[in-house]
Amino acid sequence: MNDVSLRTATSADVPAITRIYAHAVTYGTASFELEPPDEAEMARRQNALLARNFPYIVAELAGAVVGYAYAGPYRDRRAYDWCVEDSLYLAPESHRRGIGRLLLTRLVAESQALGFRQMIAVIGDSANTASIAVHAAVGFRLIGNFQSIGFKHGRWLDTVLMQRALGSGDGAPP
């Protein structure tokens, strides 16, 4: 994917990010949101993560944003400060082209450089084999499943949990 470039997201990317996410919310099961957020809400979410120095990356192809990934807090309790949760979304035409793997690999590297020790993937829908596969390809291992905890598009959905150590992981205190 030599023609794909990765960079830190900016406010100028919010319209494209909003479109990508809206498609995932409306037609997919990767997100358990039922209504797509508007640009103002997506900008608020992006700003909140960037203000806390979490990595937020976009993939560009031919000058257009075709995917994005970010890390955010896993839970809002201090003992979790060394753990992040990843999110990864691609434009529909960008699936199965290696862009997700590029984004996730970069997200792992940036999160590790920031000193985080664990990354968690909370994958909506156990049938989302593409997301499970890309996470496995980047070193995540299956931790478990929550069964039938979401209801969307007329069916019950599982959530798959995957985890990857960053840096020394739990080999030493932070």
Language model: regions and residue ranges:
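Conserved catalytic-core motifs of GNAT/GCN5-like acyltransferases
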Residues: 70-73, 122-123, 132, 136, ...
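Conserved acetyl-CoA-binding loop-helix of GNAT-fold acetyltransferases
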Residues: 96-111, 133-137
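C-terminal "cap" of GNAT-fold acetyltransferases
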Residues: 148-174
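Glycine-rich phosphate/pyrophosphate-binding loop shared by adenosine-nucleotide-utilizing enzymes
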Residues: 4, 64-68, 157
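Conserved GNAT acetyl-CoA-binding A-motif
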Residues: 111-123
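Conserved GNAT-fold acetyl-CoA-binding loop/helix
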Residues: 18-46
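A short beta-loop-alpha structural element at the N-terminal edge
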Residues: 5-17
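Acetyl-CoA-dependent GNAT
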Residues: 36-93, 104-105, 110, 165-167
